[in-house]
Every structure is written in C-alpha cells, then in structure tokens.
C-alpha cells in the first residue's frame, strides 16, 4: 500500500480514538463509551447574504455533542478551513474539557466557512446576524440551551451582533444577554 492510499483519520475519528484508549485505562464499560462518543445533534445551514448586488452563500454548522448538562457551551469559528467533521470534533472536546474540570456545561461548537478578512464590517454583520438567526430559530442559540462564545475569526463584536439577532427574534426573553458570552463589559 502506498503512502497516498493510506486513509488519514479525520479529526473526529482521532478524538474518538483517544476516548476509546482512555476508556480502557479508566475501565469504563464499552457501551457507555460508545454512548459518550455520539454527538447529540448537528445542524448545517446555508447563509445567503446580498453583497454587491450578488447573493453569496456561506455554509455553516452548529454541533451539540452533549446536553447532559445545560446549557451547551462552545465557540463560533469563522474560517475558510472549517467543515462539519471538525465542528463535531471540537464540540466533543468542549464536552470533555467541561467534564474534566467539572464545569456544568455540555459541549457545543459552531463554524461558518468564510474568511472574515474578505468582507467589510457591514457585510460581516449581515452574514453573522443571518447565521445567528438560523441557529436561534432551530434552538441552537438560546441562553438556557446553547451559548456560543468567540473563537477563531470571531470576537466580542460578532457576539454583540449575535445577541442583537437573538433579541430581535425573542424580544420577550429577559435573559437575551446570556445567549452569548465574550461580549464587551
């Protein structure tokens, strides 16, 4: 078999492999480990935004690995190098990080396939708000269930835009400011 024919494991497969190896050391039952490795849900969205008289489409994801403890917590990443597998792997890692230090959150992660440096602030605001609206309408953005934070390619600015999108959808939610962390103080 040549080097090119060898299939490299995906990021998610690597994460699952580490969990399996660890389970043997700590002697967790195999069925429990298989359940732990399964993600709860993942949503793919297409974000369409009019930019310079053309509709541009961006693919995004929000993965929820665990809802064992709520809310699920994890960043939103804007990068041209994201995909569903990586998003799910990062959500799983968030679950494990929270569990190891006994922080009462499940794990989640979001991503949008975009190079944010290629867009003006006005364009990026429209893209971010559209993405946030799609997440919120499906329950993937909610102060009690799923709370994003900044990650690669996002900052407190995007978190404010996400909070604004959530507040516009759910003006009756008095806890709307808790729908994201990483906002300016």
Which residues are covered by each model-predicted region?
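Amphipathic, alpha-helical segments enriched in basic
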Residues: 3, 7, 11, 24, ...
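Glycine/serine-rich phosphate-binding loop and adjoining beta1-alpha1 elements at the start
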Residues: 79, 99-185
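Short, Gly/Pro- and small/polar-rich lid/capping loops
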Residues: 2-46
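Charged, low-complexity, helix/coiled-coil-prone segments
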Residues: 24-38, 65-80, 109-110, 139-149
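Glycine-rich, N-terminal phosphate-binding loop and its surrounding beta-alpha-beta segment
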Residues: 43-118
